[in-house]
Amino acid sequence: MANQLYNPYLRSPKTTAGVMKDVCIALVPAAVGSVIFFGFRALLLILVSVAVCVAGEAIWQKAHGQPVTVADFSAAVTGILIAFNVSSTTPIWVVVLADLFAIIVVKQFFGGLGSNVVNPALMGRLFIMLVYPAKLMSYAMPMDVDVVSGATILSAMKQGGEAGFTLLDAFLGKVPGALGETSVLLLLIGFIYLAVKKEVNVTISAAFFATVFILTAAFGMNPFYQLCSGGLALGGMFMVPDYNFSSRTGRMLYGVLTGVIVVAIRMWGSFPEGVCYAILMVNCMSGLLENLNSKHVYGIK
C-alpha cells in the first residue's frame, strides 16, 4: 500500500505519487479561481494549509522512525482540500488545527495513506466545525460584488427564500462560499483532466450527481441549483471517488448512497449542507460495500 492505491491483486502501474500529483494539478484551476474571487488571503490559506500538512506528516514520521512519505503528494492534497472547505474569513490558526487533526489523528494514527478509514480533509473540517463553528459561518462575497458578506445559496433556500444568485453565477463561482467550492466550472475542468488521465472513478461521481439530481427534482427542489451550490461539486468530483473500490457495483452503490444522504440532510437536517457528513458516513461503510460486491481472492495452491 506504500506505492499503490489499489488492492494488491489488481495490477496497475499508477503510483500514489503519480495520482496525487495529478490531483494537485487538477485542483489548480479552482485554487486560482479562489484567489480571483476572494483575494490573496485565499492563496495564503491554501499555502499555509499545505505547508502545515506536509510539515506535520514529515515531523510525525521522523519522530516515530517511519519513512517520510511527503513526496507522494497526499499530504499536499489534504492541505489543499482543507483550505478549499473553509471561507476566506476563517482565521489561519483554525485552519492549522484542522490540518494537524487531519494529518496526525485521522491519517497517521491509523497507519498512514491507505489505512485511514475516512477522508482526512473532511474530518479536519468536521473537527473545527464542531469545536469552532462560529469561525466557519461567515462567508465572504466574491470581490466583484459590492457586498462584504452574505448567505450562501443553500442557506437562503433552507430558510425558504430565493437563491439570490443566477444559476450562471453559481456555475461560474460568483457566489459566497468556501474557497474551493463555489466555481463548478473550474472544478469541472480539473475533474475532466483526471478523467482523461483515468485517475478518478467516474462511476462513483456519476452515480452521486445523478442521485442528487433525481431526488431533488422529485421533491420539488431545483436540481440545477442543488448541483451548483454548497460543496456538492467539490465533494462529488474530488472527495466522493474512492480509489480502493474494485467492483463497479460497489462504486455505484457508494455514489448512490452518498447522494441519498446528502439530499436527506439538505431537506430535513438542521444544517443546509450535508456533503461533508454524507461522505464521512459512507466512508465508514466502504469496506462493507466492497466485500459485498467484490470477488474474494483466497490464494493459490
Short names for language-model regions:
Residues M1-V19, I265-K301:
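Cytosolic-side transmembrane-helix boundaries in multi-pass membrane proteins
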Residues M1-V54, Y298-I300:
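N-terminal signal-anchor module of multipass membrane proteins
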Residues Q4-N7, A55-P67, I103-G114, L187-K197, ...:
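C-terminal ends of transmembrane helices
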Residues D22-A30, L45-E57, S74-G79, A83, ...:
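Alpha-helical transmembrane segments in multi-pass membrane proteins
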Residues G39-A51, T89-A98, A170-T182, G220-L232:
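Structural signature of hydrophobic alpha-helical transmembrane segments
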Residues A71-A75, I80-D144:
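Membrane-interface helix-loop-helix junctions at boundaries between adjacent transmembrane segments
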Residues G114-L188:
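Long hydrophobic alpha-helical segments that form multi-pass transmembrane helix bundles
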Residues V117, A121, F224-L232, R251-Y254, ...:
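Loop-to-transmembrane alpha-helix initiation sites
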